[in-house]
Each structure stands twice: as C-alpha cells, then as structure tokens.
C-alpha cells in the first residue's frame, strides 16, 4: 500500500480503472477507422491517377487518329492517281508529269499526317497488313512472299487503315 495515499495500492495501478476500457476500445476503433480512411484515400488517389493517364492516352489517340476518316476517304483518290500513272506509261509527257507531281504531293501531305504506304512486293506475307486474294507461281520469289500487289495498303500512325490486296508465291 501507498502510505501517502492509502486509497492507491501498487497492485491497483497495474489494473485499469473500469472507465478506461471503453476509452481504449474507442481509441482502437478510431485507429482502425483512420486506417480504413487512409486506405480509401490511397485507393482514390490511385484511381484518379489512372483516370488521368487514361484520359491523356485517349486524347493522344484522338489527336493521332482524328484525320482517319478523311485519309480513309482519300484512299480511292490515291488508287485512281496510281492507276492513271500506270496507264500513262513510262514515256515522259506533261500530263504524266502533272499526275506524278500531284500524286507525290498528296502522298507527302498524307505522310505528314501519319499515313504510311504499304507496297509489299517481295516481302514475306504478313496477315496483319496484307490480304491474300490468290496464290501464284513466280520464279525467283521465295514461297510465302508477295508476288504482286493489286491494291496498296495503308497504315495510319502504325495502325492498319487498309490492308494491301496481294498475290502470294505458292509453296512447292
């Protein structure tokens, strides 16, 4: 027993008074609630950051492919100019030179906007970029390689806009 204060016993100090047990329980409850709120805040912050990244990616894709419709509608024009150049032959003439300049200028403008021409003669057949319309025999061309292109294909910023229509060399 404590002599100055007989109401306090040293054994009593190790035991908690009855009113502190509910306080400890409330403190533990609040601590667990704080931990939950912190976890929720971290999760919300991560979700917000992921949403920002997704929006930035979507905006970048929208910018990269905004002219997809226009360039897609120009593909028949490229085809017509290419066919006109083929029909004009190789003899120089003012008409052929004008067609050639127009075709090259149009291709440059399209290339500046992300369009890439696929003209795969002699390359291995790539089902991601080529559409085989037939097989043919060709000397000097390895089997599975493109022998002829019926219609050129195009990529827009490395995404297929139109596959090249090709003839593939037969396997022996």
From Swiss-Prot:
This is Protein GrpE. Its main location: cytoplasm. Homodimer. NCBIfam families: PRK14140.1 (NF010738), PRK14147.1 (NF010745). GO terms for cellular component: cytosol. One of its GO terms (biological process) is protein folding. HAMAP family: GrpE. SUPFAM superfamilies: Coiled-coil domain of nucleotide exchange factor GrpE, Head domain of nucleotide exchange factor GrpE. InterPro entries: GrpE (IPR000740), GrpE_coiled_coil (IPR013805), GrpE_head (IPR009012). Participates actively in the response to hyperosmotic and heat shock by preventing the aggregation of stress-denatured proteins, in association with DnaK and GrpE. It is the nucleotide exchange factor for DnaK and may function as a thermosensor. Unfolded proteins bind initially to DnaJ; upon interaction with the DnaJ-bound protein, DnaK hydrolyzes its bound ATP, resulting in the formation of a stable complex. GrpE releases ADP from DnaK; ATP binding to DnaK triggers the release of the substrate protein, thus completing the reaction cycle. Signal peptide: none annotated. It is found in: Cytoplasm. PANTHER family: GRPE PROTEIN (PTHR21237), GRPE PROTEIN HOMOLOG, MITOCHONDRIAL (PTHR21237:SF23). It holds the Pfam family GrpE.
């Amino acid at each position: 027993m404590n002599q100055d204060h007989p109401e306090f016993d040293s054994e009593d100090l190790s035991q908690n008074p009855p009113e502190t047990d509910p306080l400890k329980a409330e403190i533990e409850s609040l601590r667990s609630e704080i931990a939950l709120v912190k976890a929720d805040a971290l999760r919300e912050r991560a979700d917000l950051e992921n949403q920002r990244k997704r929006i930035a990616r979507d905006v970048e894709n929208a910018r990269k492919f905004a002219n997809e419709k226009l360039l897609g509608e120009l593909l028949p024009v490229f085809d017509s100019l290419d066919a006109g150049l083929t029909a004009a032959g190789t003899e120089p003439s003012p008409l052929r030179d004008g067609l050639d300049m127009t075709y090259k200028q149009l291709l440059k403008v399209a290339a500046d906007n992300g369009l890439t021409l696929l003209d795969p003669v002699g390359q291995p057949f790539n089902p991601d970029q080529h559409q085989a319309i037939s097989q043919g025999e060709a000397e000097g061309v390895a089997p599975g390689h493109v022998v002829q292109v019926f219609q050129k294909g195009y990529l827009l910023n490395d995404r297929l806009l139109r596959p090249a229509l090709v003839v593939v060399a037969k396997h022996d």
